A protein has these predicted regions:
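Compact, glycine-rich, soluble single-domain proteins
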Residues: 1-132
Length: 132
């Protein structure tokens, strides 16, 4: 399930885990020691997150129901709580530095594509070929 910034024609992640149940949102990335460069956690519904108990900083992208960026936090360090983003419906937690690398800004349109796991290897070689 890749996440693409359609406005900037850049990728945020190619390996995304969806957390849409209470327990998966609560646990989040707590058991992880790091995120790979193309990994992300997509939490829904969510308007705020915390990094209490986490071991590494993350970038955070807040999205509306139609996946428009409504908030950004770069380098949120462990043991912090984000602000509450009233217009957000979901949150994407990404490796530190992803917001800068992807040039993502508030107002950008993001696409989260459902892709079969077997298709993930093909995506790495054809990045952005489907974006006009």
């Amino acid at each position: 399930m890749p996440i693409t910034n359609l406005t900037k024609k850049t990728w945020l992640a190619t390996k995304v885990r969806k957390a849409d149940k209470f327990v998966t949102r609560l646990v989040g990335l707590l058991k992880r020691t790091q995120l790979g460069p193309e990994e992300a956690l997509w939490l829904m519904p969510s308007r705020a997150i915390h990094t209490i108990g986490m071991k590494f900083p993350i970038d955070v992208v807040f999205l509306t129901r139609d996946n428009r960026v409504t908030g950004l936090i770069s380098g949120l360090v462990p043991y912090r709580i984000s602000g509450f983003y009233l217009k957000s419906y979901s949150v994407v937690e990404l490796p530190n530095g992803t917001i800068r690398k992807s040039q993502t800004e508030i107002g950008d349109q993001v696409e989260i594509s459902l892709v079969e796991v077997s298709e993930m290897d093909d995506l790495k070689d054809t990045r952005l070929s489907h974006i006009g």
